[in-house]
């Protein structure tokens, strides 16, 4: 089903969504979802919100593919096989070892908190692989948004546009009591996903967003990461 066939028959009224401040402060990366799918009418509302994201010169370069149902289950099986075989086909390189200084510390702190919540010790390689592979079951989310983009120059500005679109998408989910998680790991299999979905080669996969109704009992949702004080990242010039 293509999105132009989805018509919203009952939009969420403004008083049914969180305030802006509540939305910003309650949004989190959800790593465990209930298996009941989000109605297509609500998915359309979220997509319409995301369409208002800013972009360089109003290019609106995002190309979003929503995958669910049997199609998503088929893709999950393929990605698990590819992951186990180490057959990665990313459009953009990514290596966590490139992080340094405070960025590395924050990355490591997240990993430690997550694996502890999942009751997996650092030396448990099999357990860590199993937990990492949950990315390719989409944390049990019944639907996933794959965010593709055209390639222009060094792609930095286009990727920035996609990031703003993704953030708007995530905030719209949060405002409705839904959850999502942006997954760089899905981009590791860009060519595989592109071929499976029939996406043209000129569109590059930056990341995907698994989303749905949060499962608050899931171990991956039992921890929270803090934010550094504003003064550590902002300089005022007066």
What are these regions (language model features)?
Residues 1-238:
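Acidic, surface-exposed loops and disordered segments
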């Amino acid at each position: 089903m293509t999105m132009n066939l989805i018509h919203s028959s009952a939009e969420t009224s403004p008083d049914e969504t969180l305030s802006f401040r509540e939305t910003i402060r309650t949004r989190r990366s959800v790593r465990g979802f209930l298996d009941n799918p989000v109605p297509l009418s609500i998915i359309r509302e979220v997509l319409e919100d995301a369409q208002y994201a800013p972009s360089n010169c109003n290019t609106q370069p995002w190309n979003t593919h929503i995958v669910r149902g049997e199609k998503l289950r088929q893709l999950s099986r393929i990605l698990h096989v590819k992951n186990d075989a180490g057959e990665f086909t990313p459009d953009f390189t990514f290596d966590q070892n490139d992080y340094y200084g405070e960025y590395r510390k924050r990355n490591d702190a997240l990993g430690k908190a997550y694996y502890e919540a999942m009751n997996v010790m650092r030396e448990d390689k099999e357990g860590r692989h199993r937990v990492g592979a949950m990315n390719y079951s989409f944390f049990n989310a019944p639907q996933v948004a794959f965010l593709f983009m055209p390639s222009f120059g060094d792609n930095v500005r286009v990727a920035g546009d996609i990031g703003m679109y993704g953030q708007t998408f995530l905030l719209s989910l949060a405002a409705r009591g839904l959850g999502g998680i942006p997954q760089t790991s899905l981009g590791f299999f860009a060519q595989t996903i592109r071929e499976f979905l029939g996406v043209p080669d000129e569109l590059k996969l930056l990341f995907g967003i698994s989303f749905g109704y949060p499962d608050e009992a899931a171990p991956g949702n039992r921890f929270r990461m803090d934010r550094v004080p504003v003064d550590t990242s902002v300089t005022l010039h007066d």
